[in-house]
Every structure is written in C-alpha cells, then in structure tokens.
C-alpha cells in the first residue's frame, strides 16, 4: 500500500528540483513528497528536518478548531492551547517563539504561499481553516534561514485542491464548556487539470463558539477559505486564493500560582476590566505558474490583505496617568501586500544534474496604531472596559526586499549538495502623531540587513537510508509589537532593540522501515543578541531586550508507521536544552539558566485502528516536562502527562458517507498548566488547561457521481 503526501509551495523553492535519483528511490512503501516540482522529492531524500501532517489526520475524530489538536507527532514543535482565543496558540520550534505573549514569533508561516507572518516576523494561526486543509508541512533547522526573517522554522498550510467528482460535506462538533462548531465545504473540478479550461475549486466556511473552560474566556470564531484554480493552457495555471476570519474573544489573563491552585477557572482581572479582543482579517492572493521549457519554470505570487485588532487590557486608571502612557486599549489596522517571483532552471554541470532557483521576495505592511484609556469616568469613578481618551497615535511602516538563490547538485549517485543564500533587508519607519506636553515626538526609523547562507550534504547509504549534515545562519528582527513598548513606562519605540543572529548545525538520518519512516536529528543553535522578554505587565503588554548569547541543542526522533491496511502508529520525542550563555537578569546571575517557556522533554505517541469504513478507535499519550516561567528560574509550570481516547463509525451507502465519533481528552483529569506567560511582572505566569473534557461530532458528505 502506498501513502502519498504532498508538501507544496513554499517548500518548492527550498528544494526546487526533482532528481532522477529521488524518483528511482521511490517504492511501494510510504512516500512523502516535499516539493511541487515534477516528479517530486520524497521526504526520505530531503536533506532537512521536514514533517508532514495531512488534513485527514488533522480532522480525524477531532474538534477541528486549533492546530494544537493533532500536531503532537511533529518533533521539535511545542504547540500549546492557551484556552484563550484572544491571544492565539503558543507555538515554538526548537525553542524559537517561546517568548511570544500572543500570536506566533520566530517562525515563518504560510497559507497557500501567502505569508501568515508579517514582514517584521509576527505571525498568526487564527485564519487557518482546518476544515479545508490538505496538509500542514513543518520545516525545522538550518534551511529555515532561506525564508528570511525567521530562525526556528517554517510552517506551510496548504488548502485542498478540488478533484472530480464534486463533493459537498457538512460537519458539526459539540464539546465541553458549551463548545460548538459547524462547518460546510464544497469541492470539485472540471477535467483532470491538464487541459486548457480545466477548473478546480474548494470553498469552506466554519463557525465556532464556546463559553470557555475558564471564567471570562468565551469566544466566537468564523473562518472562511476558498481556492480556485484555472488551467490556462498545457503549460500554465492561475490560482485565486481567498481567506478571512472574524474573532470576538474574552481574555481571562494569567494567574499566579496561588490563584491557579485555588481555582484554575477563575479570571479576577478579566471580570473587573472586561478584557477582550476582536480581530477581523481578510486576504486574497493570485499565483501564476508556467513551464517555459522542459527545464525552465517561473512562478509569481501576489497578495494583499487587511487585519484589524482592538484589545482591552487590565490596567488601572493610576497606571495610565503619565502623559507618556499609551493607555489600556490597543487599536490596530494593518494593510499588507507582497509579491514573490522566482525562476527555476534544471541543467547539468560537469555532466552532473543541477538545479538553480533565483527569486525576489517583496513584502510591505502599514500599521495605524492607536492607544486609548480603557475607562470612562462616571461620577468621578472609572468605568473599565470602555474606550476612553486618545493616548497614542502613530503610523508604522515595514517592508523588505529579499533576493535569494538556491541550488541542488547531484555530485554522485549517492552524494548530493543543496545550498542557498538570501540577502534579507528589512526597514522600519515610525511616525508619531501624538505629541503633547510630557510626551514628545517619538518618531524614528531602523534598517536591518543580513546575508543568510544555508547548505547541506546528503549521502544515501542504501535506497532506504539517507544521512545528511547541514548548516544555516538565521536572522530575527524585533517585531513592531516588540518595538512598541520600553521598560519602566518610558515612551516611544524601543529602537535600542537589535536583531538576533543564529548559527545552526544539524546532522540527521532518515530510514524507511516497511511502510513507515524513522527520522532522527541532532542539532545545535548558538544565538547572539537573543530577543527576550524584559518585563510583562498585565494582559498582552511586554517590553523586550537583547540577552547576549544563548544555546539550543537537542535531539529529535520520530516514527510514522502503518501496519496492514488500517493500523497506525505515530511517535515523537524531543530533547531540547535551551540555556542562557550570558547574564540577562537585572538582579542575580542567570548565566546557565534554562530559557523560560521551553520544555526540555516532550513525548507523544498515538496508536489507532482506522479502516476506510466501519468502526475505528485510537488513543494518544502526551508528556511535557516542566517549563520555566522566568529568566531567574524561580518559578515553573510542572510537568504533566495526559491521555486521550477516541472512537467512531464510518458508514458508506452509495455516494453518501457518514462519520460519527466521540472523544475524551485528559482522561485521568490531570490538573496542569497549559502554557506560561514568560516573565510576567506580577507573577501571573499561568494559563491553566482544562480537566477531563468530552466531545462528539459527525460529518456527512455526498459525491456527485
């Protein structure tokens, strides 16, 4: 039995060529494709740490609300559900991104080739529509440097491509804490996609609501996703992309250790200040692909979007008294656009197969950032949770222009070289329109640039066993959010914050075992000028500083195995030792301390019986070691182990398919912390996870045959 999984753009311009050797190595065993080039390159033959989770696995017996549900099988990826839809998931890769108080940091993310990461490096998972995902592709290690402003890795989400026959599917899920999801999806195609005029389409929409596990954590989320492909002629294709999300979420905030132990569901400051957040995002893209000759291809992606955010925070009136204080309400409107174009040429050099990809990536974002007081005075007393007087008004511009070159060279039948370089240029320009007595003009600008090389040698010990060694230099600038606040309540942008640079070395092994794949990687990353949290006050406001030197080193193991026709086993183990190599604490010596927000050990195993129809069942076990909450390592979230079980039944009759399932998570009702807010100044580090919780769901689909 052959299992094919595809990893398309943007990985297509990471490893752009399909080598004859890679095609010859494919057998009837499991094959994972990691480029969109003709013929593809199997995951076995990719000289990098790449993991693929297909959409069916993401949706299998799952709520289909968050990426954290079914990505545990990816080693090196620490993804945690905050139980807080106002702050997004907490996601880090090999320790990069762990400092983020909201959104995703240190990782480049894409939806169908459109960046879900802004030019400054701030990303979001909130617009990912799990209902229509074909695959989630995760790249870790040195080659992530070739994507520019990201150090930890790359996540690419790919939408399903419609096929014949047309299909319509409706699904629903009901879970604990008043959680409900409805979804509707339609897909199809005319023709087989190879002739002029052939069209494929996928359209999906979802609605999710929840009261939330914690007090003051209710949320509503409405994502939508669409993809339309048109074959212009035998050599070219045009793809239209659309994506949107509308979120309204309360923010329960963090708890102290005592508050967590007393009542993990409480939200004392959420109720007092009515902390909440609304987000609206809409984006569209256009991708043109053309084969110029048998050896030359071009691809152009253009996109534009808008993201609006309004957040109410938990700050007292007195805290906002200083003229330089930006208030307790954040009001943002971001417009972003970009274009990525590349040309790929396949040829021979010294009679050896070689491929070159030359590209240029341009991204631009303008941000209107305003701050308001989070109260109105009623009879002289503050009424919190209301938008008050203006306290901040600025326009921030960010853009980058990055040329890049990549090559793959088959040196011998067994030895190949992959290498590339990117020149990353990033500009920030801030214009301050809120100039009043006590708050001067804080306008300013900054420019960051860096050469980012990466390379890898791969050697095929056998047709089923490859080893590789790789190196890359990463580059991570401060985001505009990290520049937005200075410590000790000082006004203006924190332009003293410098970008961090990292050097990563990795050795790895990939072995095909029957109808499965066993992968292993050892890595070390040394970083200069690491950007870390200086102080975090209240809900969603943090200031940052450079921490000198840090080191991340570890081991990743993963097994994806299928037995017979329906038995599946997945396992992943990550050991990550992330420490400061210089002192970063204001008092005391933190040299040698563990970096906060990062688990040293993570283990995931799942085993299940999943036939195409009939009864199915499975279970998973997740372990995460303790996580330090601050630089001083004086507080931490304890380690935990959770168990989940699921079962369901698939019934097919004619063109109809019905899938009904149920699941229980945290089977043994473990009390644990799901995530931490790093360096929270009031000790409110902890974001509790729910105890034992349940869910039932169903989907029904019809094929028009």
Predicted regions and their residues:
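A beta-strand signature from Gram-negative outer-membrane beta-barrel systems
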Residues: 128-171
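Transmembrane beta-barrel wall of Gram-negative outer-membrane proteins
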Residues: 167, 174-209, 214-252, 276-293, ...
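Short acidic/polar hinge/loop motifs at secondary-structure boundaries
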Residues: 107, 114-140
């Amino acid at each position: 039995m052959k299992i094919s999984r595809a990893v398309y753009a943007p990985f297509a311009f990471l490893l752009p060529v399909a080598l004859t050797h890679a095609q010859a190595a494919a057998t009837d065993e499991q094959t994972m494709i990691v480029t969109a080039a003709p013929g593809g390159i199997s995951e076995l033959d990719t000289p990098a740490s790449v993991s693929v989770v297909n959409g069916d696995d993401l949706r299998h017996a799952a709520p289909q609300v968050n990426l954290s549900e079914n990505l545990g099988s990816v080693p090196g990826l620490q993804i945690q559900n905050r139980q807080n839809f106002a702050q997004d998931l907490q996601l880090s890769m090999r320790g990069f991104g762990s400092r983020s108080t909201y959104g995703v940091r240190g990782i480049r993310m894409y939806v169908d080739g459109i960046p879900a990461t802004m030019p400054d490096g701030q990303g979001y998972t909130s617009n990912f529509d799990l209902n229509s995902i074909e695959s989630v592709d995760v790249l870790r290690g040195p080659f992530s440097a070739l994507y520019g402003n990201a150090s930890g890795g790359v996540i690419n989400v790919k939408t399903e491509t419609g096929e014949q026959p047309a299909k319509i599917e409706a699904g629903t899920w009901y879970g604990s804490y008043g959680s409900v999801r409805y979804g509707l999806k339609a897909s199809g195609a005319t023709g087989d996609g190879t002739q002029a005029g052939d069209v494929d389409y996928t359209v999906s929409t979802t609605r999710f609501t929840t009261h939330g596990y914690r007090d003051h954590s209710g949320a509503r989320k409405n994502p939508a996703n669409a993809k339309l492909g048109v074959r212009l002629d035998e050599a070219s294709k045009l793809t239209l992309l659309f994506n949107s999300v509308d979120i309204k979420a309360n923010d329960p905030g963090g708890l102290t250790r005592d508050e967590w132990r007393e009542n993990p569901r409480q939200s004392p400051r959420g109720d007092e200040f009515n902390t909440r957040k609304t987000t609206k995002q809409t984006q569209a893209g256009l991708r043109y692909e053309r084969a110029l000759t048998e050896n030359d291809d071009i691809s152009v992606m253009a996109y534009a979007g808008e993201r609006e955010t309004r957040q109410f925070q938990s700050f007292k009136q007195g805290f906002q008294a200083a003229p330089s204080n930006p208030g307790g309400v954040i009001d943002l409107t971001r417009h972003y656009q970009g274009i990525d174009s590349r040309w790929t040429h396949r040829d021979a050099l010294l009679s050896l197969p070689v491929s070159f990809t030359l590209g240029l990536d341009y991204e631009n974002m303008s941000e209107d950032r305003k701050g308001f007081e989070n109260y109105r005075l009623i009879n002289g007393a503050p009424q919190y949770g209301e938008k008050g007087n203006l306290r901040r008004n600025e326009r921030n511009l960010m853009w980058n222009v990055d040329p890049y070159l990549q090559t793959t060279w088959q040196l011998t039948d067994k030895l190949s070289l992959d290498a590339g370089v990117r020149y990353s240029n990033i500009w920030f320009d801030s214009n301050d329109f809120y100039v009043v007595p006590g708050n001067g003009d804080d306008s300013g600008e900054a420019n960051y640039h860096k050469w980012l090389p990466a390379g890898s040698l791969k050697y095929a010990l056998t047709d089923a066993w490859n080893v590789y060694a790789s190196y890359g230099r990463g580059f991570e600038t401060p985001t505009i959010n990290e520049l937005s606040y200075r410590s000790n309540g000082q006004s203006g942008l924190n332009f003293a914050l410098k970008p961090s640079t990292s050097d990563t070395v990795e050795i790895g092994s990939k072995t095909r075992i029957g109808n499965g794949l066993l992968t292993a990687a050892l890595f070390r990353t040394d970083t200069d000028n690491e950007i870390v949290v200086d102080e975090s006050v209240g809900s969603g406001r943090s200031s940052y500083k450079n921490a000198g030197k840090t080191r991340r080193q570890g081991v990743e193991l993963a097994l994806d195995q299928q037995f017979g026709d329906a038995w599946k086993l997945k396992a992943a183990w990550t050991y990550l030792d992330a420490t400061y190599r210089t002192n970063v604490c204001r008092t005391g010596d933190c040299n040698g301390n563990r970096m906060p927000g990062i688990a040293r050990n993570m283990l995931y195993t799942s085993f299940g019986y999943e036939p195409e129809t009939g009864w199915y069942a499975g279970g998973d076990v997740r372990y995460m070691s303790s996580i330090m909450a601050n630089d001083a390592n004086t507080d931490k979230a304890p380690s935990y182990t959770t168990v989940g079980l699921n079962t369901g039944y698939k019934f097919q009759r004619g063109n109809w398919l019905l899938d009904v399932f149920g699941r229980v998570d945290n089977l043994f009702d473990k009390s644990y912390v799901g995530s931490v807010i790093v360096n929270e100044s009031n000790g409110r580090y902890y974001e509790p996870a729910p105890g034992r919780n349940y869910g039932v769901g169903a989907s029904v689909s019809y094929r028009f045959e």
